[in-house]
Amino acid sequence: MAHLSDVVVMEVSNTVFKHRHATRNTLARNRMLARLTEAAELGVLLVTHDNAELMWLRRHVGTDDIAEPEPYLFCLQHDWDALTPTERALRTIKGLAEFHPDWAFWGYDAALLWGLEVPNDLLGPRFLVKTGCSVTLSSGCRLLRPQMAGALERVDGVRVTPFWRTVEDCLLRAPFSYGL
């Protein structure tokens, strides 16, 4: 049993709590900026499945030079701004493939991964093979049935349609002048 005389009441200034909170925020900020910088040096987008990281990053999008080009994919804004549309598309595709390992790509997305030239104005919504993944049509993706895709291959760790199937898909969908 504790007696009232055993309890010591101390007054602690509010600045101690503010300092601890600020230190914790600075450590989190430095850690996330270091991860974003490392991802930029590797030429990829930062992909996170961690809810705490995701919440921190989303709170700082638009500030701290952080961008979220696609859901769950992050980078430093100045690095993103310096990329060409082709580089942006490639990083986005690779990031989506890392976040969704069951996804496979076709059309212009697969062409980029195969190293084919794709005009900037043909880059846009993602081209996904419907592989049992839960992609909604509202996400702007163009879906292809698996039986139409044929056997899938891996290029740079990303599942894509075979090379000649990719060429055929692109030629069938591109304006005539691009097909030449």
PLM segments and residue spans:
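Short gly/ser-rich loop at a beta-strand->alpha-helix junction or flexible surface loop bordering the NTP-binding
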Residues: 2-180
